[in-house]
């Protein structure tokens, strides 16, 4: 059976969630997915993370993937330069804000 890159990612995520581990690490987990599937997977990860007592770490360049995280760490040249939740990082108008505006677009509101 041949599966696409996105299908492989979805299967890997499902397998990880079914194991119910104490720690989940997702490194660019939705990078090969279209935006609708990304939102579905992100919602599933959020639901599972909130329903159980484990730590979930999301590593992503696509900020929409991490915007609902409890704590976001912004790295620049290997160092943490900002930290907070989505709203507080937008208020600071630092690097996270600039990246958010670049990814979402100048004409759209900064807070979703």
Residue ranges of each PLM-predicted region?
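C-terminal boundary and immediately downstream tail of ABC-type ATPase nucleotide-binding domains
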Residues: 91-112
């Amino acid at each position: 059976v041949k599966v696409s890159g996105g299908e492989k990612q979805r299967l890997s995520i499902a397998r990880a969630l079914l194991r119910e581990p104490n720690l989940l690490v997702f490194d660019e987990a939705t990078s090969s997915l279209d935006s609708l599937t990304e939102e579905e997977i992100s919602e599933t990860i959020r639901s599972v993370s909130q329903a159980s007592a484990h730590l979930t770490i999301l590593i992503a360049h696509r900020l929409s993937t991490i915007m609902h995280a409890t704590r976001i760490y912004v790295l620049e040249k290997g160092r943490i330069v900002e930290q907070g939740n989505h709203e507080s990082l937008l208020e600071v108008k630092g690097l996270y804000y600039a990246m958010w505006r670049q990814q979402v677009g100048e004409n759209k509101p900064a807070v979703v």
